[in-house]
């Protein structure tokens, strides 16, 4: 069970950006996403980042380049057996890919992508997700309070349907803390972490450090090598 947790990494998510964007969106989700650069996301040609996990005395890193306009994904990391793996694929053609890509790489990509840009996903997914503003609540850490915005996904479809993300949002509309509740029976059932280490790359804002617990065990998720490439440019803009 622990090995599965480390390989699939903490969270399961139902869909990826690009679905149902023309439908009605949650106003509170839009307000949060705008703080992270939603209005300028159309300028972004590619996003680069390395997902780093520290859990149960083990460290895992996965590097990605994602082109949101085309759905092209490039992965540099290891497979479940620890062997080096590099692959590039189109999400629209996922059915053509090997089992390793379909069963390991793409679920990991979706997971890591939600960690790095969840404020956008909460907005993009809001036509199908139940987004509720629950007002000011005490932070799970017990220190201070913030607005609680709950994002609950449908019990049907996706890698792990029925998940709920509780976002604790400050007065500046930045997420300060979040609690993830898994909808199914897979582990972990509960992940609770900070959102800190804020950096900006071009027009986008990223939280690059998350510290907390996964089913009670200490966990840290961090991002390095974060950068964006804007349309019409060949240069990467590093987060700082």
Per-segment meaning from a language model:
Residues 6-15:
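Bacterial N-terminal signal peptides
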Residues 26-103, 129-138:
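N-terminal mature ectodomain segment of secretory-pathway/periplasmic proteins
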């Amino acid at each position: 069970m622990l090995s599965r947790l480390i390989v699939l990494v903490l969270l399961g998510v139902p869909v990826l950006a690009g679905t149902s964007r023309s439908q009605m969106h949650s106003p509170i989700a839009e307000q949060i996403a705008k703080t992270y650069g939603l209005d300028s996301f159309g300028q972004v040609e590619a996003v680069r980042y390395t997902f780093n996990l520290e859990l149960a005395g083990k460290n895992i890193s996965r590097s990605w380049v994602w082109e949101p306009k085309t759905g092209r994904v490039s992965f540099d990391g290891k497979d479940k057996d620890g062997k080096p793996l590099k692959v590039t694929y189109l999400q629209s053609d996922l059915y053509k890919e090997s089992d390793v890509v379909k069963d390991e790489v793409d679920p990991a990509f979706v997971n890591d992508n939600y960690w790095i840009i969840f404020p956008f996903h909460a907005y993009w997914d809001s036509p199908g997700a139940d987004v509720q503003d629950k007002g000011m609540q005490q932070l799970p850490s017990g220190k201070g309070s913030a607005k609680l915005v709950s994002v609950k996904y449908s019990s049907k479809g996706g890698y792990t349907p029925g998940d709920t993300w509780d976002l604790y949002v400050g007065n500046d509309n930045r997420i300060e803390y979040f609690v993830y509740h898994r909808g199914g029976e897979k582990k972990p059932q509960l992940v609770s972490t900070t959102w800190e280490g804020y950096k900006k790359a071009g027009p986008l804002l990223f939280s690059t450090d998350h510290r907390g617990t996964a089913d009670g065990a200490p966990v840290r998720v961090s991002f390095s090598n974060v950068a964006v490439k804007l349309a019409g440019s060949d240069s990467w803009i590093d987060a700082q």
